[in-house]
């Protein structure tokens, strides 16, 4: 579970009340990036997670940043979340924010087949920019409240995520379904990845016995 304070810098978007990120608790800082095609609900998911508010109007994002201080699995963390553009005309900006991200929420809409096709390209681009075979990424099928308009089967998305070593959530920003869970799972994936990336600790030097230098008898 997570809890904590939040703030945002999105233009024309509601700002959360309460304390800001000026004095984060001791712990971790993770840069999370929300990516996906245009109109899939990236901003709605982000604002629902940050401010518990559903944005119903589609307002194309260029780039908005938010901060949330929360606790995941008992460990405090500051999450710097970047909500990115999905439109093709802003595609040149993608590599810049991909370089900075510690983890990615890869979003499509279950009622938009094209948006699902696009996540494969974004996944490949993330790994290329990071020069890694694996990276912390969580796949989210948003707009689960539009089941009667579904174009992407749950089994298809689950199979894709499993083959690419991602956790998959079907979420609804409108119903606040699996919103917190997706972000929390991404934090866990980032932690696990960073632990694996840490260099091994150097072997500790053997302790010398009291009584001076060791001697060799001839």
Curated annotation (Swiss-Prot):
Residues binding GTP, per UniProt: 36-44, 83-87, 142-145, 172-174
UniProt-listed Enzyme Commission number(s): 3.6.5.2
Catalytic activity: GTP + H2O = GDP + phosphate + H(+)
Entries under Pfam families matching the protein: Ras
Domain of life of the organism encoding this protein: Eukaryota
GO molecular function: GDP binding; GTP binding; GTPase activity; protein-containing complex binding
Prodomain residues: 216-218
EC supergroup of this enzyme: hydrolase
Free-text description of this protein's post-translational modifications in UniProt: S-palmitoylated by ZDHHC19, leading to increased association with membranes and with rafts/caveolae as well as enhanced cell viability.
Alphabetically ordered keywords of this record: Cell membrane, GTP-binding, Hydrolase, Lipoprotein, Membrane, Methylation, Nucleotide-binding, Palmitate, Prenylation
Record carries keyword Repressor: no
Annotated localization: Cell membrane
One GO CC term on file: plasma membrane
Matching SMART domains: RAB (SM00175), RAN (SM00176), RAS (SM00173), RHO (SM00174)
Cysteine methyl ester modifications at: 215
Composition bias, Gly residues: 7-20
Keyword Nucleotide-binding recorded: yes
Membrane topology according to the record: Lipid-anchor
GO biological process: cell migration; face morphogenesis; leukocyte differentiation; negative regulation of Schwann cell migration; positive regulation of angiogenesis; positive regulation of endothelial cell migration; positive regulation of endothelial cell-matrix adhesion via fibronectin; positive regulation of vasculogenesis
Gene3D superfamilies: P-loop containing nucleotide triphosphate hydrolases (3.40.50.300)
Family: Belongs to the small GTPase superfamily. Ras family.
Protein purpose: GTP-binding protein with GTPase activity, likely involved in the regulation of MAPK signaling pathway and thereby controlling multiple cellular processes. Regulates the organization of the actin cytoskeleton. With OSPBL3, modulates integrin beta-1 (ITGB1) activity.
Assembly information from the UniProt record: Interacts with PLCE1. Interacts (active GTP-bound form preferentially) with RGS14. Interacts with OSBPL3. Interacts with ZDHHC19.
Protein's name according to its UniProt entry: Ras-related protein R-Ras
Native source organism of the sequence: Mus musculus (Mouse)
Gene that produces this protein: Rras
């Amino acid at each position: 579970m997570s809890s904590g304070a939040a703030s945002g810098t999105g233009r024309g978007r509601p700002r959360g009340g309460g304390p800001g990120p000026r004095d984060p608790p001791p712990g971790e800082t993770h840069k999370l990036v929300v990516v996906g095609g245009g109109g899939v609900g990236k901003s709605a998911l982000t604002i629902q997670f940050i401010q518990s508010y559903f944005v119903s109007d589609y307002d194309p994002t260029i780039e908005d940043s938010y901060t949330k201080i929360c606790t995941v699995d008992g460990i405090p963390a500051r999450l710097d979340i970047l909500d990115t553009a999905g439109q093709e005309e802003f595609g040149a900006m993608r590599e810049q924010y991909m370089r900075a991200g510690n983890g990615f929420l890869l979003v499509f809409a279950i009622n938009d087949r094209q948006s699902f096709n696009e996540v494969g390209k974004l996944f490949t681009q993330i790994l290329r920019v990071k020069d890694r075979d694996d990276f912390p990424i969580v796949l989210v099928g948003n707009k689960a409240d539009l089941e009667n308009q579904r174009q992407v089967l749950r089994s298809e998305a689950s199979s894709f995520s499993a083959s690419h070593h991602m956790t998959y959530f079907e979420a609804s920003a409108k119903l606040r379904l699996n919103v917190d869970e997706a972000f929390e799972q991404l934090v866990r994936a980032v932690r696990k990845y960073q632990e694996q990336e840490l260099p091994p600790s150097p072997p500790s030097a053997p302790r010398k016995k009291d009584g001076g230098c060791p001697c060799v008898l001839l």
